[in-house]
């Protein structure tokens, strides 16, 4: 049986034809790469099937193509679209609250397949987060490509003058970096485009190990990107440029990218505007995606265009600068060739460039390069010898590089020929796919798999629906009348089982539960998720213990956190567990949790920290949590998550209410859960204790389904 490979590409507008590159900040070169990689892999004889999972979008503002649940790409490759969060299109920074729901959907999709993937390849931080969760739950190796890394972006934005607060507000950079750390901790293989990316950018992450990385430079589609002009294509490009340029036959300085801050296009316009020599020799051509009404653009795009328009006006560049409003994706190769025919230069002024696929495309079409001296372009220029690098943060240096690049026609021809030959030799798609498969097969076959993981149900579910009750808060002081009503309602529905959620150990939880006189529970999720048990007698689940114990070093956790005393004090032995280390805080200080997480990352411990009731902190194995225990249970029972109602109340319980299960927040809840009030699958009870549980059961009609 051949390989089944599953790729995760969650944000942007992704389809198999007519990619809307540059339409917004999320639909860029990464989109092209993932599509071409999927097609290239599917064409290999050892690969049977390739699925690219993305988000299903139902939004009148975008094409109905993105609402198609299944799109064949040919040759065994497919796009699979799964719903996640609101139906409307969302930029990637707004997707974070819904990624647990996507992880649930991907897990269910894989569990329903006759064959599970040989590996999951996650692209970018959001998919890395989802991929890490699915990999943990199903025991499938994870391959990760960050494409653009949060720590590097944060560094560049800080250098550009933005504050930490501004960066966080615009880019949700903290969640992105945390997601990248989590993906790196789980990955069997990290695909990078260059040595610099591995040695300098990924190396800033605590969870990254150098031996995880393999440098596999992307390839170029030689069928599209080549130096030979196709009949009629030049006139099409001229029609795009004609409204803007007085002397359209001048040598162009061309850039093709998205209108986002990182691409640094205003700096290129200013360098051009400051140089009479550049204006005499060249036109400036900016292909920045397709745009319609500026009022409908995202703020970042709108700001970039505003800066460009102001610079054109300030330097009086009318007739010298082209910025076409619309173009078709299939015109991009023709635009490169049109520029090459006029002895043009392709310019990449980006502040940071993990690789630079457009540099390869331009070179394949015979266009020399002037590029940022950051990341991938260094490797490309070293291999291709077809242009020069420049410090794009220094306008004088950028201006000088552009002036020198167009000064010598013989050198231009040498650069052109070098680029065409080097791309053919070093950057073919066949070579990329062969190298990719070799690295992934070797790393993923050696990846440590759990001794036992659930992919299909191992037993028939004992119930059709499951109510999970918080034992520590929701029923702590329940009135007898409310408990009696709840008891009667639950006993009347044999298809609905109950389970207990608690930070206590089994002995303590059993004593507390006995006081409630409720029907016996089918399941116990205890010690904050580190202990999973079944039935009234509390039979331990050995598969869960095996799953979470991998890589767990309880003694090392205690040693690492000793340095935080007296901020943290170990709780008494009766509150500890084999897979749970519990502390009490000296004071409920906001920064302690992040301090603990940072220490665990720095020491590369496979552990996670949670704060409860503002005073208590638990450290568990990386794979252990109440939310993960619920999903392990549902996979084993074959119970759909939307048939599970989770009652939550405590600080740190937000993760219980993410994803596909139904959520009920008790009236006595911690204020940190108020952020979930707009979630469609989260109901906030207004009545106390057992009455609130009954209120939630009625809201969802949970006992009458």
Indicate where each model-derived feature is located:
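Short beta-strand scaffold positions
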Residues: 122, 144, 192-193, 371, ...
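Catalytic cores of nucleotide-sugar-dependent glycosyltransferases that transfer UDP/GDP/TDP-activated
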Residues: 1-360, 364-448
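Active-site phosphate-binding/coordination module
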Residues: 482-573
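Asp-based phosphoryl-transfer active-site loop
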Residues: 461-478, 657
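Structural alpha-helical scaffold elements that stabilize or flank donor/cofactor-binding regions
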Residues: 113, 183-184, 339, 460, ...
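Receiver (REC) domain switch/active-site residues of two-component response regulators
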Residues: 188-189, 522, 661
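Mg2+-dependent phosphoryl-transfer enzymes with acidic/Ser/Thr/Gly-rich catalytic loops
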Residues: 620, 627-705
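Conserved acidic, metal-coordinating active-site core of Asp-based
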Residues: 558-659
């Amino acid at each position: 049986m051949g390989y089944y490979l599953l790729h995760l590409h969650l944000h942007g507008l992704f389809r198999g034809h007519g990619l809307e590159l540059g339409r917004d900040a999320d639909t860029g070169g990464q989109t092209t790469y993932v599509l071409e990689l999927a097609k290239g892999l599917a064409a290999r004889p050892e690969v049977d099937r390739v699925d690219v999972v993305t988000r299903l979008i139902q939004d009148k503002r975008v094409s109905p193509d993105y609402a198609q649940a299944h799109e064949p790409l040919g040759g065994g490759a497919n796009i699979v679209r799964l719903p996640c969060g609101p139906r409307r299109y969302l930029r990637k920074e707004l997707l974070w609250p819904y990624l647990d729901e996507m992880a649930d959907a991907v897990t269910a999709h894989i569990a329903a397949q006759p064959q599970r993937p040989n590996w999951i390849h996650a692209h970018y931080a959001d998919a890395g987060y989802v991929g890490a969760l699915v990999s943990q739950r199903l025991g499938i190796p994870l391959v990760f490509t960050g494409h653009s890394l949060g720590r590097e972006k944060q560094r560049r934005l800080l250098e550009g003058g933005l504050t930490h607060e501004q960066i966080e507000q615009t880019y949700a950079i903290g969640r992105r970096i945390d997601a990248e750390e989590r993906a790196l901790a789980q990955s069997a293989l990290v695909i990078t485009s260059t040595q610099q990316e591995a040695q300098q950018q990924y190396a800033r992450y605590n969870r990254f190990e150098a031996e995880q990385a393999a440098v596999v430079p992307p390839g170029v589609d030689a069928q599209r990107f080549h130096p030979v002009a196709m009949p009629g294509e030049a006139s099409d490009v001229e029609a795009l440029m004609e409204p803007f340029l007085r002397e359209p036959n001048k040598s162009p300085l061309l850039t093709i990218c998205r209108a986002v801050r990182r691409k640094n296009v205003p700096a290129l316009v200013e360098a051009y505007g400051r140089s009479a020599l550049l204006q005499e020799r060249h036109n400036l051509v900016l292909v920045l995606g397709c745009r319609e009404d500026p009022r409908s653009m995202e703020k970042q795009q709108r700001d970039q265009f505003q800066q460009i328009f102001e610079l054109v006006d300030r330097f009086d560049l009318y007739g010298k600068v082209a910025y076409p409003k619309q173009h078709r994706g299939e015109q991009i190769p023709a635009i490169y060739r049109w520029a090459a025919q006029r002895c043009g230069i392709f310019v990449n002024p980006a502040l940071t460039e993990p690789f630079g696929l457009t540099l390869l495309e331009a070179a394949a079409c015979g266009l020399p390069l002037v590029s940022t001296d950051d990341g991938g372009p260094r490797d490309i220029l070293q291999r291709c010898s077809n242009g020069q690098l420049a410090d794009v943060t220094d306008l004088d240096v950028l201006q000088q590089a552009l002036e020198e690049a167009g000064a010598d026609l013989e050198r231009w021809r040498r650069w052109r020929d070098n680029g065409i030959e080097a791309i053919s030799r070093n950057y073919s798609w066949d070579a990329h796919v062969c190298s990719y498969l070799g690295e992934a097969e070797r790393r993923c076959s050696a990846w440590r798999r759990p001794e036992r993981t659930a992919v299909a149900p191992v037993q028939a579910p004992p119930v059709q629906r499951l109510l999970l009750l918080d034992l520590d808060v929701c029923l702590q002081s329940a009135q007898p009348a409310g408990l009696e009503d709840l008891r009667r309602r639950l006993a009347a529905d044999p298809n609905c089982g109950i389970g207990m959620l608690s930070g206590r150990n089994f002995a303590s939880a059993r004593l507390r539960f006995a006081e409630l006189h409720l029907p016996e529970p089918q399941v116990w999720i205890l010690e904050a998720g580190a202990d999973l048990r079944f039935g009234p007698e509390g039979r331990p689940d050995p598969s869960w213990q095996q799953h979470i114990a991998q890589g767990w070093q309880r003694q090392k956790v205690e040693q690492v956190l000793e340095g935080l005393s007296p901020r943290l004090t170990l709780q008494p032995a009766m509150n500890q567990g084999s897979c749970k280390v519990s502390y009490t805080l000296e004071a409920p200080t906001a920064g302690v949790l992040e301090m603990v997480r940072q220490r665990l990352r720095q020491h590369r411990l496979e552990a996670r920290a949670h704060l409860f009731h503002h005073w208590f902190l638990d450290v568990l194995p990386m794979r252990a949590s109440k939310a993960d225990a619920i999903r392990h249970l549902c996979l084993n029972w074959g119970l759909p998550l939307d048939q599970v109602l989770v009652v939550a109340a405590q600080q740190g319980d937000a993760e219980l209410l993410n994803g596909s299960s139904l959520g009920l927040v008790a009236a006595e809840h911690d204020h940190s859960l108020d952020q979930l009030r707009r979630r469609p699958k989260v109901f906030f009870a207004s009545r106390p204790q057992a009455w609130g549980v009954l209120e939630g059961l009625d809201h969802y009609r949970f006992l009458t389904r």
